Amino acid sequence: MYLIAGLGNPGLKYRKTPHNAGFMALDALADALDARFSKKGNGKVAEARIGGEKVLLVKPQTFMNLSGDCIAPLAAYYKIPSEQIAVCYDDKDLPMGKLRIRAEGSAGSHNGMKSIIARLDTQNFPRIRMGIGAPQGIRLMDYVLHKLSRQEQAVYAQMAQDAAQAAILLVREGLAAAQQKYSSKAH
């Protein structure tokens, strides 16, 4: 069983903001797998299958900085090893629209990832980093929470579709296949 999480903040106020790129990816993934989210614990959860593999889709509803409070208990309950937990999230250090898939690593400056790493007590889990390309001269908090323009929404929609397909490929064929196909694609 895999757990695929997408990070974001709950509520309409945050819906079309860069910080909710992970939620956008999970919505695209749920659509592709014909799965429906329902409230479970501290998150919105959907069950699906990718090939013969059962997959738990998770959108934490704890707000970004406490994402681990949702993901870690679900992983423990379902006995999912960290290597089978993939997290989709916004990354300010990548150009907008670019994906980078990694097997493990630090959280960098991302507080949601810091929370997950702390609660899982490991950095050893795959992540699908979604480029939001934070520009110079704007406070990071202001940038990640700004409403996306129509042009940005189109880029994010395509990036979310690609992240969803990367997650499917990761489960079906493994991390290396997903990295090879999606880690260098930009929009």
Predicted regions and their residues:
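Nucleotide and nucleotide-moiety/phosphate-recognizing core
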Residues: 2-104, 113-128, 136-139, 146, ...
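Gly/charged, well-structured mid-domain segments that form the phosphate/adenylate-handling core
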Residues: 132
